[in-house]
Amino acid sequence: MYEKKEFADFELELEFRTLRPINGGVQFRTHWLPILPVPENAKPEDMVYDCYGYQANIETRVKKATGGIMEENGRGYLAEPSDESVKTLTQKGWNRMKIEAIGPKIKVYLHDVLSAEIEDDKFIKGYILLQVRADEVIKDEPVSVEYRNIRIKDLGRIGNWVSLFNGTNLDGWKNYGSEEWTVENGVIVGKSGPKKSEGYLATEKTWKDFRARAKFKMLGEGNYGFFYHSSIKMREDGYPIISGVQVEVEPGYPTKTGWLYESYKRGWLVEPNTQTPASWALRPNDWNEIEVKCIGNKTTTWLNGIKVVEFDDPSPNLFEGFFALQLHTGGAAGIMWKDIFVLEELK
């Protein structure tokens, strides 16, 4: 069972009990994706899906397991429960669990006693699921995990996130090239102009270290991007030449969206790997969210809350510049952008 809303930062409290030994858990920042590796040329309807994300464990088949933190379909146990928290558990009775997820800091409590904590940013938002795994049936009788008094405090995204788009006009932005950028129904719409060439909509302000996020919806096939540390020179024929690092945005499934490409210089900074959870996280024909964090030489990107790449650049060429939305040659149908934010007071 899952909550049909995604949560990033939150506090969740609930009670649970198991009348028979069983494995269950509370999954959070979770995504429903194909099981990896996906066979080459596999069709979506032929793929087998499962959950990817974090889990606060409920495990009563062994003594010390409830309250630990796991990564489902990934690294396994990330933190075991503390001895003090396990002692608070009541066998066959109701137990209280609390989960705090604020940025990369995740804590699990049992009866207000800290059970496990991690600092991890592989998943920064996703769904919440209640899980039961009946791997063994006792005397042909069903086993279950019971949940009650489920309460969640949605904290949104902690921090001073400042909007770069006012939802009304393109104040604070500048158009480079012949492509058309307009505001329609509160979103930025980029479409091919008469030359069907390459164009950019760039912020007037520049950044060095930053964390930014934006939602996009592709209107068709093509190639797009979210650039940072950028500058643009115009050729005599009016064609814009950008110097910057591109966070790729493209409609493939699997997708290369979120991987890093340095235009006109080194190309792919990391060769895209399409056998990762993030490569299957794109939602075709729907809104998606890209996020990028850059501090010094280190850049991290996420697609729909799943980490795509973490890259330490050994020889960066660019250290400051503006953000730019790209409409590349071939993206004739266009792209829409909204909810563009940058985090002030980055730590």
Report each predicted region and the residues it spans.
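Carbohydrate-interacting regions of secretory-pathway proteins
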Residues: 1-347
